[in-house]
């Protein structure tokens, strides 16, 4: 199947516009890149993780035997879990601009993370000297030590065995907080994508 060969991760986006909880339904086994991205972008908020057994029609099709696409579901309140669902009250009053915007922001983060989630490897042995590469701050501020620490922690785990999400999870930051660090390290050729 051509889809399976060409899709590395996808998201079923449904019921995304209300102001209630966020929800996530994994792929059949919950071990795909789509699952990893979904859990990472939702980890900083209160969300409900459902079992694949709580799936709906779309999940049944995308993840069925023989199809097995790596597509996870991200939504606000899961279909069937809000009182207005499939009643005459299930209308545009259920959604809101802030709910839609919040849903949009999460999906945007998921796509950005998919695009930037690579395996990185440091190009030098041992801990690199940051100062001669212009990566060490020349003025000490309240945040400069923490910034250097995150960069050094990233470098420690950029061994080619961990992707960006793995590293972010290991060092306890959001992957998006590493985007700028990755760009800086790539610019001075301290890391490479493998």
Region annotations inferred by a language model:
Residues 1-35, 47-64:
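Acidic/histidine-rich catalytic neighborhood of metal-dependent amide-processing enzymes
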Residues 14-20, 81-90, 132-133, 161:
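Short acidic (Asp/Glu) and glycine-rich catalytic loops that position anionic groups and cofactors
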Residues 33-36, 57, 98-106, 149, ...:
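Generic recognition of stable, solvent-exposed alpha-helical segments in well-folded globular domains
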Residues 35-38, 68:
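Hydrophobic alpha-helical transmembrane segments of membrane proteins
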Residues 40-45:
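Helical lid/core segments from catalytic subdomains that handle acyl or acyl-like groups
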Residues 56-118, 165:
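Active-site-adjacent mobile loop/cap segments within catalytic or ligand-binding domains
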Residues 89, 93-156, 182:
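Acidic, low-complexity/disordered tracts enriched in E/D and polar residues
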């Amino acid at each position: 199947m051509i889809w399976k060969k060409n899709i590395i991760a996808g998201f079923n986006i449904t019921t995304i516009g209300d102001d209630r909880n966020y929800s996530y339904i994994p792929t059949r086994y919950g071990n795909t890149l789509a699952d990893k991205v979904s859990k990472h972008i939702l980890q900083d908020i209160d969300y409900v993780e459902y079992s694949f057994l709580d799936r709906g029609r779309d999940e049944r099709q995308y993840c069925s035997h023989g199809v097995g696409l790596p597509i996870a579901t991200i939504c606000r309140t899961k279909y069937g879990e809000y009182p207005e669902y499939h009643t005459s009250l299930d209308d545009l009053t259920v959604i809101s601009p802030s709910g839609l915007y919040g849903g949009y922001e999460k999906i945007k983060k998921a796509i950005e993370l998919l695009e930037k989630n690579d395996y990185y490897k440091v190009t030098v042995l041992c801990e690199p000297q940051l100062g001669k590469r212009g990566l060490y701050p020349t003025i000490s501020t309240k945040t400069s030590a923490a910034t250097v620490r995150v960069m050094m922690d990233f470098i420690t785990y950029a061994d080619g065995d961990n992707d960006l999400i793995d590293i972010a999870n290991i060092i306890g930051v959001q992957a998006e907080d590493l985007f700028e660090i990755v760009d800086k390290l790539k610019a001075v050729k301290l890391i490479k994508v493998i």
